[in-house]
Design a protein with these regions (language model features):
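Bacterial N-terminal signal peptides that target proteins for export
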Residues: 1-9
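Bacterial N-terminal signal peptides
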Residues: 8-18
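Metallo-beta-lactamase
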Residues: 19-117, 121-125, 129-143, 163-219, 236-243, ...
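Active-site metal-binding loops of divalent metal-dependent hydrolases
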Residues: 51-52, 103-106, 138, 164-165, ...
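Short, conserved loop/helix-junction motifs that constitute active-site signature segments
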Residues: 150-156
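Cap/insert and terminal regions of metallo-dependent hydrolase folds
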Residues: 231, 235-321
């Protein structure tokens, strides 16, 4: 009888101790945390890195549209006027180097964003391993992650930016002439890029040649004065990183003339977008886009007078086709 009582007490104690643990282990996680996505491109490897997502009111962000046009196009794609906008960066493994395209936001926009380092770690890499960072342009969702407070976040990386872009945003005279809403971009350059320059780690480039074997900057002006695309090519395969020349596949692919309130020169941005989309659709190469739903990799396909987005096919092996 005593043994039976002991057994029952032991079972009761075990239940009290272990049932919360079991319950915790079986509690579903309602948050999607993709973090990173691998893709092979010839001998190169591309790893999309998620900085997070943030709500964007596309009916306010997108301009040069007919009344109700943005809402209509969004509805056709089963999207509301406010969507969760991805912030993507890309790690390219090429010729023994680790090259990051854009650096995310760090703590600039709060806890929903700023996860590039976390995603990089999940993918198996550390900030100290990055050899180079290629910036598409000087907006905080692309350069914010260059600094952690007053420390350089990627201490061994050389940062590359077009000379046109750097000369414009690092010139106080240009800030003085800018409209009030654009002055924060100059402040961002001072906070995040000036320390890189002072440390001797900033390199500017002119367009017309490779930065690394198989990696070439391409002029993509309009969103900012010196906005850059980056083309990577290996064994006959190509991917073009478009930065912010395309911010909504649902709206700007069917109607490439629709622009963004953040465009420095909206007319030039629209012209650049039309040219880039036409080339990508005709040639059939991959594109990587900073704000299309993670991982932001896919193809552009012609569709009537516009285009449609064909996202990468999910692949556990990393081939993607």
């Amino acid at each position: 009888m005593k043994n039976s009582i002991k057994t029952m007490l032991s079972l009761a104690i075990a239940f009290v101790i272990y049932s919360p643990l079991a319950k915790a282990q079986n509690t579903p996680n309602s948050l999607n945390q993709p973090g990173y996505y691998h893709m092979a491109l010839g001998d190169f490897e591309v790893i999309a890195l998620s900085d997070g997502t943030t709500p964007q009111k596309l009916n306010e962000l997108l301009t040069d549209a007919k009344p109700g046009e943005v809402e209509h196009l969004l509805k056709q794609h089963y999207q509301a006027s406010t969507i969760e906008c991805s912030v993507n960066a890309y790690l390219v493994k090429a010729n023994g180097k680790l090259i990051l395209i854009d650096a995310g936001t760090s703590d600039v926009y709060g806890p929903a964003l700023g996860h590039i380092t976390e995603s990089l770690n999940k993918a198996g890499y550390k900030p100290e391993q990055i050899d180079a960072i290629l910036l598409t342009h000087i907006h905080m969702d692309h350069i914010g992650g260059l600094m952690n407070g007053d420390k350089i976040a990627f201490p061994n990386a050389t940062v590359y930016i077009s000379k046109i872009e750097a000369d414009y945003y690092l010139n106080p005279a240009n800030k003085a002439k800018a409209v009030e809403s654009a002055k924060r971009f100059f402040d961002g350059a001072e906070q995040k890029l000036r320390p890189i320059l002072i440390a001797g780690k900033l390199r500017t480039f002119d367009f017309g040649g490779e930065l690394f074997p198989g990696i070439t900057p391409v002029a993509g002006f309009g969103h900012t004065p010196g906005h850059s695309f980056y083309a990577i090519e290996s064994k006959g395969e190509k991917m073009l990183f478009l930065g912010d020349i395309l911010v909504s596949d649902a709206v700007q692919l069917p109607e490439p003339s629709i622009t963004s309130v953040y465009d420095y020169d909206a007319g030039q941005a629209a012209t650049t977008r039309k040219k880039a989309l036409a080339e990508a659709a005709t040639a059939g190469y991959w594109v990587g886009v900073s704000h299309i739903s993670f991982p932001g990799i896919g193809h552009i396909r012609a569709d009537g007078k516009g285009y449609i987005w064909v996202p990468i096919n999910y692949s556990a092996s990393g081939r993607g086709q």
